[in-house]
Each structure stands twice: as C-alpha cells, then as structure tokens.
A protein has these predicted regions:
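Membrane-embedded beta-strand positions of outer-membrane beta-barrel proteins
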Residues: 3-5, 30-34, 52, 62-66, ...
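Residues that define the transmembrane beta-barrel architecture of outer-membrane proteins
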Residues: 10-16, 44-48, 82-88, 95-97, ...
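Outer-membrane beta-barrel "beta-signal"
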Residues: 172, 254-268
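Short loop/turn motifs that connect adjacent beta-strands in outer-membrane beta-barrel proteins
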Residues: 1, 22-29, 54-62, 94-100, ...
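Predominantly the C-terminal beta-signal and adjacent terminal strand-loop region
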Residues: 230-259
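Extracellular loop and loop/strand-boundary signature of outer-membrane beta-barrel proteins
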Residues: 4-7, 35-40, 73-90, 116-126, ...
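C-terminal beta-barrel architecture of Gram-negative outer-membrane proteins
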Residues: 153-166, 170-221
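Transmembrane beta-strands of outer-membrane beta-barrel pores
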Residues: 3-11, 22, 34-40, 66-74, ...
Length: 268
C-alpha cells in the first residue's frame, strides 16, 4: 500500500494518489490506484485504475485492467474540461524460451483529442468514438541465434483519427556471441531487419476542418550492433526502400537515413 500528494504545476496544484496491491495466491496478483487531481479553474480529474493477473500454469498468463472515472487531458488549456474514462483491456499470453504468443482486446472510451502544436498541417484531430481494438503477436526462436517476431493491431469497427488501421511490425534478429572465438562471452553481435506497415486512414484535420488522408505505407529498418566487453557500437538505418510516403504530411522520412554511435565504459 502507498499514498502520495504533490504540487505538480500551476495548472495542477494537487496530485494525490493511493495505491494497493495484493498477491493472495501464487500466480495471482491484483493492484489498484485511485487518483485525484485538482486543476486551475476549479477542474478535477478523478479516476481509479484496477489491474489483475493470473498465471494458472507456467508460461500462460491472463491479465486485465480497467480505468474508470474522468480526467482533464490538458490542464494547461483553461477551456479544456474533464472527459469520461471507460477503458478496458484484457490479454492472454503464452511465453516460453522458443515460442511466445499473445492476443489482446481493448476498448477505449470516446474522447476529443488535441492536435499537436509541432505539426502545423494537422492543427486538430476529430472526436474519436468508443473503439474496440484487437492485437495479436508472436515470437518464434527455432534456434538460439535467430528470432522471428511481430505484432498486428486493428480497430474492430471504424477507423479513429490519428492512428493508422492494420498497423503491424515484423522483425528478424540474428544474434551470436561467437563462443568458439570468444569463450568468455565478452563478444555479442546483433543483426536486425524489421518492417512496419499500416493501411489507409485519417491522420487529423486541416485548418478548414477537412480530414487529412493518411496513405498506407511500408518501411524497412536495419540495425547492426557489436559489443566487446564494455565497448559497443551500433549503426541504425531506416526507410531502406526509399519510399516517399510518410506518417505526418510535411514531415518527410529521409531515404536511407542513418544514425550511429559508440559507447565505451571503463574504470580507472
């Protein structure tokens, strides 16, 4: 159990929270949090979060959570008011060393989001209705040095603005320590190739209030990472297919963009 109270900002003068958790049986846990926030202008955010997890057998887990109440999304905007929260989520997962499977369901309550100030071409996002989401994922490691993994998420009905439908990501990772050459295990090589894709949707609204179309796209990304004891380096490249498509209009993703870095830790 725990409790806290803070003065956050001039717009949130009180942030009080109380938490409690319990593990009555092996493989069963529950947790809860109650939040009260007082905002400038006499506004309040009051909600509770409840979560529980059950592991009936080794590797199999069932988890669920709910968030109920009301919250002010942007306290610094004096005209913003509290919106109802009715969010639910449930996940069934199976994880072992060579295989992992996951299926999830979520329902998010209706809300009116704010646009992002840094995206001038998308000044606003339309109201979002109550939405149900289905997410599935898998991980397969046929041998110790190779891993195939991916996930897929899509709303069951309708397409909310700001989030792409049929969103997925898949990746293959090769990893080896070259134990014959480095029996101490100080060497680690990681090669990763991933693909992210989404379908057609609506990213937001323009200055006139008309929907801004989001075209479906596919992007490829690679990562090379080498570690030798406390010395490591990486080379990350994205948009390997040099596509002109993007996620936010006006923010072009460079073709064959790269970033690299070196890290060396040592003690004197």
């Amino acid at each position: 159990m725990g409790a806290s109270a803070f003065y956050r900002t001039r717009w949130t003068t009180l942030d009080a929270r109380a938490t409690a958790g319990v593990t009555p049986l092996a493989g069963l846990a529950a947790w809860g949090e109650a939040v009260h926030q007082h905002h400038d202008g006499g506004r309040n955010s009051d909600y509770v979060t409840l979560a529980a997890g059950l592991e009936p057998v080794r590797g199999l887990a069932l988890t669920g959570s709910a968030r109920l109440g009301s919250a002010v999304p942007a306290p610094s905007v004096l005209t913003d008011t509290a919106q109802d929260l009715r969010d639910y989520q449930a996940t069934l997962a199976f994880n072992r060393s060579r295989l992992g499977l996951q299926a999830g369901w979520a329902r998010t309550s209706a809300f009116t989001p704010f646009g992002y100030a840094e995206y001038l071409r998308i000044p606003s996002i339309g109201p979002v209705a109550e939405t149900e989401w289905v997410t599935v994922g898998a991980r397969i490691a046929p041998v110790r040095w190779i891993t195939l993994e991916g996930w897929y998420s899509n709303p069951r009905e309708g397409v909310p603005e700001g989030l792409p439908p049929t969103h997925s990501q898949t990746a293959v990772t090769l990893r080896s320590k070259f134990l014959r050459q480095f029996p101490s295990g100080i060497f680690d090589l990681k090669l990763r190739l991933s693909m992210e894709a989404w379908g057609d949707g609506v990213i937001g609204r323009d200055a006139t209030g008309d929907p801004v179309r989001l075209n479906g796209a596919t992007f490829f990304r690679s990562l090379v990472q080498i570690q030798l004891q406390s010395f490591s380096l990486y080379w990350d490249r994205w948009n390997l297919s040099a596509t002109d498509l993007t996620y936010v209009p006006g923010f072009r993703i460079p073709a064959y963009g790269s970033s690299f870095g070196v890290r060396w830790e040592f003690l004197n």
